[in-house]
Amino acid sequence: MEAAGGLKRWIKPAAGLALVLMLLTQLQPAEMRRVLESAQWSWALLALILASLANLACALRWKAIVVKFGQPLTSSSAIVLYFQGVTANTVLPGGIIGGDVWRTLGLSRLGMARLVAAQSVLLDRASGFWSLSFLALSAFLLLQVMGQGLAISAPEALQILYGAGILIMSLTPLALWRISPKLLHAALSSAGISVLSQALTIAAFCCCLLAVQAQFSLLTVVLLCAGIFLAAVIPASIGGFGSRELASVFFLTAIGVQAESAFLGSVLLGLTATAQGLLSLPSWLQCEQNEKNA
């Protein structure tokens, strides 16, 4: 049983590594080297700042949800737990615990029932997805109002399927009213900061793309970011790298972005999370030490 659990723990990073290696075999090393040599690292630095602000907003979104669930939680505690979760996801690939589970356990240590704590983390995740869909739908409507067509090189059926998925996800919060009005109120209480957090994340991604000199339409990238970031939840990544890079290449090459730039832009975004995870590592280690000494 223990061996099976250990094997399961390594499936996700192994799949992520396989995805990255598969992508690398499809890219041109010489072109990747050229892109990196001409990269504008000031954009990457700005991306790190924006990504950090995005995670800060995510932590405050989660705090608002937890408070609506009836658990007192200070902003500082929420921020510490959230960034420790980033460490668990990025610096400890395939390791002891995932970021969402870490946050759930953190709330349970503060006295919150574990099931309710897990619900708050799940609703926090869902709120982020809804915000991505809302921004994508808004970008699509703006493109229509501005009379700009969608220059997407993909089968029409796939475009319709993607659009339908975005629309459905944008409307799914309405289903919470039938499931639990309490959940809907908790989601609405953090809606504004949730949209802000996702807008900051998209801005960070755009900065990463600009760092590797990708040329793109901002509104079209906002439209496609829902698919790119949602792909990141697929359990096939190592340290946060894998499924997002595959989705980035898939979606962005459809709008004319060079495959190498799409891949490297996504990798740069992942490195902003890795940097934040490393900065939060001392806090994570201290918490682990306190648990052992308790």
Predicted segments — roles?
Residues 68, 94, 104-110, 252-254:
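Helix-loop junctions at the membrane interface of multi-pass solute transporters
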Residues 56-61, 94-103, 233-248:
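Transmembrane helix boundary and interhelical junction motifs in multipass membrane proteins
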Residues 87, 123-126, 230, 271:
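Transmembrane alpha-helical cores of Major Facilitator Superfamily
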Residues 76-80, 95-99, 109-126, 257-268:
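Membrane-interface alpha-helices at helix entry/exit sites of multi-pass transporters
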Residues 86, 90-97, 125-137:
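Mid-bilayer segments of alpha-helical transmembrane spans in multi-pass integral membrane proteins
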Residues 1-83, 132-134, 138-234, 243, ...:
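Predominantly cytoplasmic-facing regulatory/coupling regions of multi-pass membrane proteins
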